[in-house]
Amino acid sequence: DQPGIVEKLAGTIAAAGGNWLESSMSRLSGKFAGLLLVSLPREHQSELLGALEALQTPTLKVSVEATGITVDDEETGSMVGVEIVANDRPGIVEEIARLLASAQINVVSLETFCESAPMSAEPMFHAQAYLQLPEATSVETLTELLEQLSDDLMVELLD
C-alpha cells in the first residue's frame, strides 16, 4: 500500500454514488491487493468505471467486474469458521481444497500463513477459513473430514 490508496478508492466510489459494502485487503510479498464489493445504481456504473480507470498508474491496477448479484442473495446451509494447523508440506492447500470441494463445502474466505514451530523450528501451516456447509453437513462431519487428511492436522472451531 501507499498512503492514500484506500482513501482514493473510497472517495472515488462515494463520488459516483457507490456504497463500499465489503472488502479484503492485504500486503503480500511486497504487493498490496484488495477485493471490494460495491453497490451502485446502474445509471452510475459507467461513471464509476471511468473514474476508477483514471486512478490507474504503473503501480496501481484496477479491475472491475459486475457480479449481477445482490448482497441479500440467500445462502443455504450454515457458516462455520475453522483454524487448521499442520506440518507444512507442498500441496497442503490443494489437499484441503479438494476435500472441501468434494464435500460441496464453499470457501467464503481463506487466509493462510506459515511460521516456525516454537520448539523444533519446523515450518507449520496455518489456515483460517470461513466455510459455508451444505445443509446435510454438520460441523462434526467437517472436522472429521479435515482431520482424516493427515495425523498432524488439527482443526479448531472459531467463534
Specify the residue positions occupied by each region the protein language model found.
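A conserved regulatory-domain signal marking ACT and ACT-like small-molecule sensing domains
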Residues: 1-159
